[in-house]
Amino acid sequence: MSLSEQAILEQDKNIVSNIVQDILCEQISIEKTELNLDLYIYEDLKIDSLDLVEIIKQIEEKFDIKIDDSKILYMNTLEEFIDFTLQTIYMKHGFEYLQNKQF
């Protein structure tokens, strides 16, 4: 992977991370400063199934994707969830999608 590809990947991850964190903060009433990527989704953030359904719905609408609910159960940390969301975006829209879209 070239340096420019790595930079674009980091930029894309930052875009997705910021949006996912904004959605989380709104849904579970937490301050963004309290979040870090190592937090466990269920244990640390205390996200229940109803919260998760709403969070996924908002992410799907924001990025025009469909998240495979069955795979969410295997994600532990916020970073794993963000990485999975980014992969799902790339699979549906390609690598240029986030660079060409205004969020």
Swiss-Prot record:
* Positions carrying O-(pantetheine 4'-phosphoryl)serine: S49
Q: How is it modified after translation?
A: 4'-phosphopantetheine is transferred from CoA to a specific serine of apo-ACP by AcpS. This modification is essential for activity because fatty acids are bound in thioester linkage to the sulfhydryl of the prosthetic group.
The residue ranges of the Carrier domain are 14-89
Among PROSITE patterns, the record links this protein to: CARRIER
Quote the pathway field. Answer: Lipid metabolism; fatty acid biosynthesis
Entry keyword set: Cyanelle, Fatty acid biosynthesis, Fatty acid metabolism, Lipid biosynthesis, Lipid metabolism, Phosphopantetheine, Phosphoprotein, Plastid
Q: Which GO terms describe its cellular component?
A: cyanelle
Task: Output the Pfam families linked to this UniProt entry.
Answer: PP-binding
Q: Does the keyword Plastid apply?
A: yes
Domain of life here?
Eukaryota
Asked if the keyword Plastid belongs to this entry, the reply reads yes
Question: Where is the protein found, in the record's own terms?
Answer: Plastid, Cyanelle
Role played = Carrier of the growing fatty acid chain in fatty acid biosynthesis.
Q: What is this protein called?
A: Acyl carrier protein
